[in-house]
């Protein structure tokens, strides 16, 4: 049974491994036996990663250099790097969406059958059905510059809540890309959709969403905010054989907030 969760002998790549969920995942992967872990980030991680490649996920050239350096044979790719909505719209989309796609498409052809791709999405992206047609239009644009131009041309949609929109794209991209990744390469693609997490990024989320909204969300799901370790455990699990039959799934990890919302057990009075 323990082999189901083992990372022994696996080549792993993780983006955003310096702080928060990524840093917690680095520790857990080491505990699970991973001895070939490459972290892509703009800052060097302090955890037990075996290799660090300085990478700017908003810059296609930087990503391409990382892909060349990584080489083939990646068993598990964690697309974890992300930014909050306090940044300019095009920057958020480049990091949270375009960078994820470029890295994935560069690494995937060299991944062995049975591998896994795990994206970090968010429950903030659960409104994707309302924008599905536009999101598929965006996903259908292969060229980086053209995709950035699409964001500018659709500024009213993208800028209304750019973080939420970027995570809508992340959820749809997970489903969309999972079809090709599994049919052509035998590689599963899933995402984790957390609620509010107690990480250094929380300050940016408070600026963007207000502390009242964050606390209200936590209060509606048991009153306990998620920790980086909570979500890292879910990420790490999705990269193992324990989730062998899962593909194209956006796994919600929010202490039950979405369940309460879906079943009309939410108290909106806390929003004022």
PLM features per residue range, with description:
Residues 18, 22-27:
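N-terminal Rossmann NAD(P)H-binding glycine-rich loop of SDR-like oxidoreductase domains
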Residues 46-61:
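Rossmann-fold cofactor-recognition segment
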Residues 84-85, 90, 113-184, 196-197:
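Catalytic loop of short-chain dehydrogenase/reductase
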Residues 224-253, 258:
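C-terminal substrate-recognition "lid" of short-chain dehydrogenase/reductases
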Residues 155-160, 211-230:
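Catalytic Tyr-x(3-8)-Lys segment
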Residues 183, 188, 246-248:
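Short, small/polar-rich loop/turn modules that mediate ligand/substrate recognition or access, typified
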Residues 2-3, 247-272:
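Short C-terminal tail/terminal secondary-structure segment
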